[in-house]
Amino acid sequence: MAKLKITLKKSTNKAVKSQAATVKALGLGKIGTTVEQNDNPQIRGMIRKVSHLVCVEEI
């Protein structure tokens, strides 16, 4: 299964609460943190919701 490398690029301070919760659910905390997640529809939907805050690469 493919993996996605997700990096938090912008702060969640002024983001809507649901977007901040989505970033936390992805496993991201501070700006610059990176996580690897499996590529599935659930993760893709979460990324789409916060696409303006994160950077995504396929591994």
UniProtKB/Swiss-Prot annotation:
What the entry lists under PANTHER family is as follows:
LARGE RIBOSOMAL SUBUNIT PROTEIN UL30M (PTHR15892:SF2), MITOCHONDRIAL RIBOSOMAL PROTEIN L30 (PTHR15892)
Q: Which GO terms describe its cellular component?
A: cytosolic large ribosomal subunit
Q: Record keywords: Ribonucleoprotein included?
A: yes
Xref: HAMAP family:
Ribosomal_uL30_B
Keyword DNA-binding set for record: no
Q: What species was this sequence derived from?
A: Ruminiclostridium cellulolyticum (strain ATCC 35319 / DSM 5812 / JCM 6584 / H10)
InterPro entries hit by this protein: Ribo_uL30_ferredoxin-like_sf, Ribosomal_uL30_bac-type, Ribosomal_uL30_CS, Ribosomal_uL30_ferredoxin-like
Subunit comment for this entry?
Part of the 50S ribosomal subunit.
Q: Which GO terms describe its biological process?
A: translation
Q: Which UniProt keywords apply?
A: Ribonucleoprotein, Ribosomal protein
Gene3D superfamilies hit by this protein: Ribosomal protein L30, ferredoxin-like fold domain
NCBIfam families for the chain: rpmD_bact
Q: What is this protein called?
A: Large ribosomal subunit protein uL30
* Similarity section: Belongs to the universal ribosomal protein uL30 family.
Q: Mind telling me which CDD domains this protein's record contains?
A: Ribosomal_L30
Gene Ontology molecular function terms on file: structural constituent of ribosome
Which Pfam family would be a valid example here? Ribosomal_L30
